[in-house]
Amino acid sequence: MPVTPPSLFPPILPTRQGMLAVDELHTIYWEEVGNPDGIPVLFLHGGPGAGLSPQHRRFFDPNSYRVILFDQRGAGKSTPLGEWRNNTTQLLIDDIERLRTMFGIERWLVFGGSWGSTLALAYGEAHPARCLGFVLRGIFLCTSAEIDWFLHGVRWFYPELYDEFVAPIPDDERGDLLGAYARRLLCNDPKVYWPAARAWSRFEGRRVFLLPQEDEQSSDTLDLGVGRLESHYMANGGFLEDDQLIRDLGRIAHLPAVIVQGRYDVICPPLSAYRLQRAWPGAKLRMVPDAGHGALEVGIARGLVTATEQFKRHGRFD
């Protein structure tokens, strides 16, 4: 497993946790951490489908922040696991608003990495009056070019990993690799969807870090959530118009933001972070020279904690 960066705050347990039924199908897990009178912050995990980790609570000073975290529909402890029906970006945004209302929060800092950065931007552009600012990492704008890179661009860096991912798919289906995996992942036969889920999760997980890490134990929860929901969202363009997040950036451009990006991120390459900052001159782009995609890589974790420390002191990122 990756070494825990020294810059993180000590492990902490939730002060409250529970389940919230958001429709007739989905129930989402939530937790609250830190000071109930602190600065409200919303943590958005990646994937989609990756779910929460106890480490996610540790980017924030628990004496200064009131941290709200939740497993998005179909992820982690939310039920049903891997459920893609009634699961869209707009519905996730609605869930965030349900949580904000439930907790009685007027405005909050929004913190998200990878797919979490996508959802953070989409939420902010839908509800700018509810946001204090943004801490974003590993930017994914969910454009068609980024989706194509995720599936095919990696072969320039990890050709053996790409070949392993493609190998189970018959030759006549390889012209639409995303469609081929989605058909397998979203079917009802566990003998079909489990191997596909594990292959998808390996394909992504083995390129998260710049430097190789010891293999972690496989998690069925992670594999099924990530495989099903990433393929579902990518097949639908993230339920966004192409480049919508850049187009609508004016709605949040007045708010403070910091972007922490690994220079050698081969899942969400730096071009997207660069494009976002160019369109958002007030945002601070902090390129980490010796990191890939992982939030727990030392330089990225340090950058994220630095950002939350700056915001608690000044309400901005300088």
Predicted regions and their residues:
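Conserved acidic catalytic loop of the alpha/beta-hydrolase fold
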Residues: 90-108
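Catalytic active-site module of serine/aspartate enzymes centered on a nucleophile-bearing elbow/loop
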Residues: 283-318
